[in-house]
Amino acid sequence: MALHSMRKARERWSFIRALHKGSAAAPALQKDSKKRVFSGIQPTGILHLGNYLGAIESWVRLQDEYDSVLYSIVDLHSITVPQDPAVLRQSILDMTAVLLACGINPEKSILFQQSQVSEHTQLSWILSCMVRLPRLQHLHQWKAKTTKQKHDGTVGLLTYPVLQAADILLYKSTHVPVGEDQVQHMELVQDLAQGFNKKYGEFFPVPESILTSMKKVKSLRDPSAKMSKSDPDKLATVRITDSPEEIVQKFRKAVTDFTSEVTYDPAGRAGVSNIVAVHAAVTGLSVEEVVRRSAGMNTARYKLAVADAVIEKFAPIKREIEKLKLDKDHLEKVLQIGSAKAKELAYTVCQEVKKLVGFL
């Protein structure tokens, strides 16, 4: 069994080595059982327009492109900042409902709760013993978050990227959908995989990034910043559960400029261009087609047209979320089944890692 596993690992390594290290644009793939996708999302905060267009839509698509797909509600990551236990418990179920409503299908992918698979933390510890402290301290997100917290970040926040690497490598994932702000963390994952392989023999595939074609959705109030769950300005972020009235209000108040024409110029007209990009994404039209159809419309009217398109896109998802949240038992069962499937995969890999390291 060990020889078979090592042979399979070499096959995966040969495939990965044939690709250049780094990020790759999302390929149009036939289903391939030799490839595995992993991604995760924190349960805290309500899913917003940027999350949906930048991540969840591609998650749904990837289910049909790969035979092996795992999506995790990464609750361990969420406690790097203080959480109310009761709120966190409910947030996990709420995020499960949202993901299912958006199109994540447990028949096509494994949807599970990270904390219910203890191998994540076991592998994280092993990997943390292979990375130097300065490497983690120089990551952009660590510096940004500790600056915001007045340099009072926890050890958990510092080692967050190592747990993230363990999440990915634990399932011998070959592909990871990521946003632009996660590229540096993916480089750490790749380096840890290569470092482990160099020390213990070729075992982990070196995962490739799948960059979403949708650029980061910007804040409606500050187009220089990305849309965020934690933005204190309530008008900045469009949440998937917002009412039609709230969505209209947020787009009406969206920052643009003093030119009334609708054009796409991210460098020169960031606010309008952000709204055009959102419009294109929710309708499936190209940016050029959106601009063409908006000829003669001023930005005030155009913002309301985009609000209507977003409302139409989210309406069936909202209805399904409300329906799913009424059935707590179903949501818990989905997570239990998914976590059991993930545990089966994780246990095998973790046992092999323990043998290689010398624990067994």
Curated annotation (Swiss-Prot):
Q: Which gene encodes it?
A: WARS2
Single GO term (MF)? tryptophan-tRNA ligase activity
Q: Where does ATP bind?
A: 42, 48-51, 179-181, 217, 226-230
Q: Which family does it belong to?
A: Belongs to the class-I aminoacyl-tRNA synthetase family.
Question: Which reactions fall under this protein's catalytic activity?
Answer: tRNA(Trp) + L-tryptophan + ATP = L-tryptophyl-tRNA(Trp) + AMP + diphosphate + H(+)
Q: What does this protein do?
A: Catalyzes the attachment of tryptophan to tRNA(Trp) in a two-step reaction: tryptophan is first activated by ATP to form Trp-AMP and then transferred to the acceptor end of tRNA(Trp).
The highest taxon in the source lineage is Eukaryota
> Quick one: which residues bind L-tryptophan?
167
The name under which this protein is listed is Tryptophan--tRNA ligase, mitochondrial
Q: What is the effect of changing residue 13 to G?
A: In NEMMLAS and PKDYS3; hypomorphic variant, clinically relevant when present in trans with an amorphic variant; impaired mitochondrial localization
Q: What class of enzyme is it?
A: ligase
